[in-house]
């Protein structure tokens, strides 16, 4: 504000100096005015003084209707001002044929009026969230919105009248469209404020307020989208692509699309709330905190969500108008369609798991029995290996193997082979864990297979030698023969 005063003072002194110079040098009124309108320096200083007057008037209106601005309002003003300034510069490039000295004051006036609309919207939002507001604040905000609506209507009427008189597209088309948007915005803000006052007079018990507010915003976005589309095509047909409208057109379309989707989802949820959300039982109200987290009041009747939290019916309905998540745990009130389609399968899976717990004993017994069968077969395999190893050990200790030159098979016996006449054929030695059966369980299958083949070779050699002993010494080897046969048969 201090910088504005300094700037205004310097501008005022410069304007007085140039006016004094014009009248002192020309001596008459008409030549002095011609000089002021033709001299570039004089014209710039006069336009600068007009800008200072408009800024001073803007601050006066702000002080009368709003008073001092809050920090959030100043931030909103700074953010929106730079964005609107860039859009107005783009608009100037489109309407460059109509650019003149009278065009700049109109553009600055439009920017300042837009700034007042931003402040009005932000102040109404602040009043709606403030518990206690003075009557003076209500009177000032109502008067401010009435003043803005009057200004919008006057400028819109002036622009439309100029269009009708000229009957051709000009910069008045741009101003008429902008003030039409501002007028509808002012009406929407005022109606929203009326909803707030009505709800306040009803002690916050007006259940239809969120519904009406939602419809109001939906209609406002629809009107803005329609006007943006019409203005876009009019400018495109007469001037070219309106670059300054692309962002506003996209944002308006996006907001309208979101509101329509929210509305359809809200109608889908609230159409069958009684069927979708069951009533909470007295036991559930007693077991949980019987305080509605939305309105912070005690609950005697409540609706239960899928997640298990309880809320008032009207509180839940008003909450679902803004978002479709639980206020407590942020879970979706209605799961997505893919989740709902997968839910029966999950329930069947859950039921199957419950049924599976009852039959888990039988299944476990079957698994254990099958495991027991495999363990029994493995135990029998180990037993055969142990028996073969025992037989090899018995025969290795009890038998005196004949020398190689005495071991000769009869050539007349079919299917027999001639034993080699090399030096004594000894059995390969293996460290077989005969006593410890757990040692076989720790061995790999390859190792067990090698051991089995080795023991089969041993048994074959033992059978041949046993047959040789039976043919040579039947009387003396009777008892060992029977013992060897029984052990060998057990090993097989």
From Swiss-Prot:
Q: What is its EC number?
A: 2.3.2.27
Q: In which pathway does it act?
A: Protein modification; protein ubiquitination
Looking up SMART domains in the UniProt record yields: RING
The segments annotated as RING-type zinc fingers are 292-330
- PROSITE patterns recorded for this chain? ZF_RING_2 (PS50089)
Record topology, Lumenal segments? 25-40, 120-135, 192-221
**Recorded catalytic activity of this chain's protein:** S-ubiquitinyl-[E2 ubiquitin-conjugating enzyme]-L-cysteine + [acceptor protein]-L-lysine = [E2 ubiquitin-conjugating enzyme]-L-cysteine + N(6)-ubiquitinyl-[acceptor protein]-L-lysine
| Stored PANTHER family | E3 UBIQUITIN-PROTEIN LIGASE SYNOVIOLIN, RING ZINC FINGER PROTEIN
The protein's name is ERAD-associated E3 ubiquitin-protein ligase HRD1A
UniProt organism field:
Arabidopsis thaliana (Mouse-ear cress)
